[in-house]
Structure formats: C-alpha cells, structure tokens
C-alpha cells in the first residue's frame, strides 16, 4: 500500500488553543483511499521546523499533505518552506490575485495590503480552488510523489480535499458503509446482528456509540468486495431497518426535515430543559424554513403558563417535568403556531433538581398532531449530555412517527 504523511502547521495547535480536527479527518479519509498514514506531525509557524519536516517525510512517503500556513501574514510560511525544500521559486499569480480580491470584496470593504502572499504559487504547482475561503491550495508532483498544501480551517479544507479524492484513490482503496441508529443500544444491536457480522472475514466491523450520533455500525472492506458488502447491508437492514436513521454522513435532523417535506407537514417545538437545542438542530438543515414554523423556549413555569397555556393546576399537581405538562405544552403550541406537528420537551438536566420519583435525567417528550405520543426517559450523563440526548431523542421519536410507526 502507498504511504502518506500529514503535517499540520500552526503554533496555536502546539499551544492547545484549537483542536487538530484536520488530522483526524485526513487520517480517516486517507485510509479509505488506500493509504497507510505513517506519520502525523504538528509544527509551529517556523520556517526551519516546517522545512525540516517536509524534507524528512518526503523521503518516506508517496503522499504528503500540509495543512495551515497559507494565509497572508508573515507567519504563514508553508509555501515558503515547501518551495525552499524543493528548490523552486515562488511567483505571484496575477490572475489568482484578482480572483482572491474579488472574493474578499464580497465580504469586506477593504482589501489587506499583504493579500498578495496568498497568490504566491510554487513553480510547477497546480492551484487548488478554495470554494469557502480566500486561501487557495496547491498540488505538486515531485519525483512521482504528491505534495498537497491545504488551508487550516476545517470548513475550507474538507471540501477542497473531497474534490481531490478521485485523483488520490489507489488500487487498495476501501469501501465503507456506516449505518446509524439512535434508539437501540449498542450491545442489543450487535447481538441482533452477530450471525451476519461475525460469520465472515471479508468485512471489518466496528461499532461506536456516543450521545450525539447514537450507535454507528461501520463496515469496511476493499473496493473489490463492494458487492459482498452491499448484500451484507441488505441483510442487516432486513433485521434492523426500522431502527436505522441514516447512512454514512446523514444526520438525524436532515432525515427529519426531509421526511417533513415529503409528507408536507409543518413543525413547531416547545423546549424547556433543552433551551432551544432542538430548534437549533432543525434550523441547521438547509431548507428547514419550508417546514419549520418556529420554537418556544419556555424555561420558566410562568412562560409555560402565559405563552403555552399550561394550567397552574397541572404544574402544582404534576410539576413541570411530567406527562401532563408536556402534553399541555404541545396543545398550547399548536394553538399558538398552527403547526401540523408539535413537539415538546421538559426534563431535569441536573446536576441538581432531582427527586427520588424524578431523578436527574428524567425527561418527558411529547409529539402531538391528532393525538399525543408521550415518552418518559431516564438519561444518564452530565448536564450537556442529558440535554443533547433529549433533543436527539425528540428527533428520533419524530422520525419514527413520520415513518408511520404507531409507537415510538
């Protein structure tokens, strides 16, 4: 297999000021493209340090990717370092400079004087378009080896790298499918599928679980075994299809918005313990405005009463964290917004506020269209985990409801 190395550049990485998300992303992607990543290194904004690392790694790998250090300031030294190691000149690309200036004009009234540095191109390099930011990337071929310079911000790097994947794919490239589940525990899923997953040695199986994406079943094999894996996925879906919410990069909120559009339904949400988290997840999806009317964050009991019409008697008798309260929240929300489907959440996120009857992590979620579907949960974890799980489970329940399940 071909070998690859990654150099992430930036003193802020060495000082722990930002997470090195680029290294994680690139390692995963390069593995799928058929490379063995032999080294990931981080160096500061220092010309000698960058140059030495480039010189060393170029002797060992077929593909070298450098991230960061492509901005316009004096400490953006990646171009200079690579040019120095390769003994090539840096030339100002006037056409590229004009494009960079036009891009900057869309967002800023003044163009920095030092912006010319971003238009310096290493002799023989191919310029890589940056669809998000102003710093272009560069690609060079050196004695059969590929050197790629990419900007540091992940939101810029990811689409630029994705545009290169077809060119970088090797004969050892992998084929991978990730199946995503939320309301089924990892151990239960694995037990349900053990006869399919572990009666073969062609597909590598890995399960991962967290409170944001739920359980992810990652299936990986070589590209030549694609048909085998596709058949395996069909068998898995025959057993677990009703629990599946997404495949590969699909997010729960994207699936829910798509289902709402397909069924021509509008949505409104009323949140207490999640504090707008559910609304935020929904509006993160492009096109959500077609189906999402809005949300109410009714954190206090007064707001629950005055905005959503929850009765004083209900709050005194059952409390804000109760089946009765969330049902009245959705009923009031429906009157307020006229949405087809209303969802409400109320719970105890902690660390205080729990009782023996309703410990920290107790959460009620209600879905109301023509009748109520109310569920009680006892989530574990810290405050943020409980809030996140509440919002995600509300989406999962809504997904199941929209898919036509009688029970969520």
Swiss-Prot record:
Organism lineage: Bacteria, Thermotogati, Thermotogota, Thermotogae, Thermotogales
Protein name: CinA-like protein
SMART domains membership: MoCF_biosynth (SM00852)
A matching Pfam family: CinA_KH
Family matches, as InterPro entries: CinA, CinA-like_C, CinA_C, CinA_KH, Competence-induced_CinA, MoaB/Mog-like_dom_sf, MoaB/Mog_dom
Highest taxon listed in the record's lineage: Bacteria
SUPFAM superfamilies, alphabetized: CinA-like, Molybdenum cofactor biosynthesis proteins
Family per similarity comment: Belongs to the CinA family.
HAMAP family given in the database record: CinA_B
């Amino acid at each position: 297999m071909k070998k690859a190395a990654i150099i992430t550049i930036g003193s802020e990485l060495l000082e722990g000021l930002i997470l090195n998300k680029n290294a994680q992303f690139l390692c995963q992607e390069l593995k799928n493209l058929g490379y063995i990543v032999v080294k990931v290194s981080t160096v500061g904004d220092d010309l000698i340090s960058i140059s030495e690392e480039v010189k060393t790694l170029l002797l060992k790998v077929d593909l070298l990717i450098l991230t960061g250090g492509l901005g316009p300031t004096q400490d953006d030294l990646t171009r200079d370092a690579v040019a120095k190691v390769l003994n090539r000149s840096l030339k100002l690309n006037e056409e590229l400079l004009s494009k960079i200036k036009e891009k900057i004009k869309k967002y800023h009234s003044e163009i920095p004087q030092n912006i010319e540095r971003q238009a310096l191109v290493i002799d023989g390099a191919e310029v890589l378009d940056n669809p998000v930011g102003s710093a272009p990337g560069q690609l060079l071929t050196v004695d059969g080896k590929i050197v790629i310079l990419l900007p540091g911000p992940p939101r810029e790097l990811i689409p630029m790298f994705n545009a290169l994947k077809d060119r970088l794919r090797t004969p050892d490239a992998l084929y991978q499918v990730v199946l995503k589940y939320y309301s089924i525990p990892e151990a239960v899923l694995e037990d349900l599928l053990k006869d399919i997953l572990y009666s073969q040695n062609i597909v590598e199986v890995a399960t991962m679980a967290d409170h944001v994406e739920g359980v992810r079943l990652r299936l990986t094999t070589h590209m030549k075994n694609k048909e085998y894996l596709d058949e395996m996925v069909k068998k898995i879906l025959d057993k677990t299809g009703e629990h599946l919410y997404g495949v590969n990069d699909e997010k729960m909120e994207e699936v829910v918005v798509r289902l709402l559009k397909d069924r021509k339904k509008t949505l409104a949400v009323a949140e207490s313990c999640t504090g707008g988290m559910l609304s935020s997840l929904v509006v993160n999806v492009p096109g959500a405005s077609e189906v999402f009317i809005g949300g109410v964050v009714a954190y206090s009991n007064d707001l629950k009463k005055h905005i959503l019409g929850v009765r004083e008697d209900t709050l005194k008798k059952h409390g804000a964290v109760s089946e009765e309260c969330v049902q009245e929240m959705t009923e009031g929300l429906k009157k307020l917004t006229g949405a087809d489907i209303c969802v409400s959440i109320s719970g105890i996120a902690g660390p205080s506020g729990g009782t023996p009857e309703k410990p920290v992590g107790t959460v009620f979620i209600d879905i109301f269209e023509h009748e109520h579907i109310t569920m009680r949960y006892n989530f574990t974890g810290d405050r943020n985990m409980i809030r996140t799980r509440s919002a995600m489970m509300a989406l999962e329940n809504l997904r199941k409801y929209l898919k036509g399940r009688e029970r969520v």
